[in-house]
Amino acid sequence: MISGPNCLRVGQLAPDFSATAVYDQEFKTLKLSDLKNKYIVLFFYPLDFTFVCPTEITAFSDKYNAFSELNTEVLGVSVDSEYSHLAWLQTDRESGGLGDLSYPLVSDLKKEISAAYNVLNSDGVALRGLFIIDPKGIIQYSTINNLEFGRSVEETLRVLQAIQYVQSHPDEVCPANWKPGDKTMNPDPIKSKNYFAAA
């Protein structure tokens, strides 16, 4: 079951969904709106038992604590069934599997979630879409890769930190490549000169 607009843009409300997910070797019903008051990294990947996908999925799991410390939940989604997810989770990493993950994998067998987030390609699989959703359910960041190359977990974490910073410091903006501890700037023609003078 899914509800949401057909055309998604940053700044819009993320489409809600309810679907079966696999977490901790169990099937569970997951509803996006139940994660209110948290940031969400929602990423789509093409298919289970493939090649680039496990490198991304396990990389997000290995960095899960860093996301959790930022009040952020991570969700992976593909058009595979929950049974396929479970089988992949029960395959060790050395054999191309996932092993134990720190976050849920969502089954989008009917392809409704992928369609709502505009990541479904003509072959019926999801492109590598990634969305950062804030605690109010607003999409703050989105990116879509083609199938052949993976995403950077470190860059996702950096963007999340920048989003959280500007939301808690509404009079400041983050320049290119900003990381926590770096200088920010005031979006004002006069005050911004302080940043550029020190750059």
UniProtKB/Swiss-Prot annotation:
It is found in: Plastid, Chloroplast. GO terms for molecular function: thioredoxin peroxidase activity. GO terms for biological process: cell redox homeostasis; cellular response to stress; hydrogen peroxide catabolic process; response to oxidative stress. It catalyses: a hydroperoxide + [thioredoxin]-dithiol = an alcohol + [thioredoxin]-disulfide + H2O. Pfam families: 1-cysPrx_C (PF10417), AhpC-TSA (PF00578). Residues 8-165 form the Thioredoxin domain. One of its GO terms (cellular component) is chloroplast. It comes from the Eukaryota. InterPro entries: AhpC/TSA, Peroxiredoxin, Peroxiredoxin_AhpC-typ, Peroxiredoxin_C, Thioredoxin-like_sf, Thioredoxin_domain. Its main location: plastid. The Cys-53-SH group is the primary site of oxidation by H(2)O(2), and the oxidized Cys-53 (probably Cys-SOH) rapidly reacts with Cys-174-SH of the other subunit to form an intermolecular disulfide. This disulfide is subsequently reduced by thioredoxin. The active site is at C53. Keywords: Antioxidant, Chloroplast, Disulfide bond, Oxidoreductase, Peroxidase, Plastid, Redox-active center. It is an enzyme of class 1 (oxidoreductase). Its EC number is 1.11.1.24. Homodimer; disulfide-linked, upon oxidation. The active site is a conserved redox-active cysteine residue, the peroxidatic cysteine (C(P)), which makes the nucleophilic attack on the peroxide substrate. The peroxide oxidizes the C(P)-SH to cysteine sulfenic acid (C(P)-SOH), which then reacts with another cysteine residue, the resolving cysteine (C(R)), to form a disulfide bridge. The disulfide is subsequently reduced by an appropriate electron donor to complete the catalytic cycle. In this typical 2-Cys peroxiredoxin, C(R) is provided by the other dimeric subunit to form an intersubunit disulfide. Belongs to the peroxiredoxin family. AhpC/Prx1 subfamily. Thiol-specific peroxidase that catalyzes the reduction of hydrogen peroxide and organic hydroperoxides to water and alcohols, respectively. Plays a role in cell protection against oxidative stress by detoxifying peroxides. This is Putative peroxiredoxin ycf42. It comes from Pyropia yezoensis.
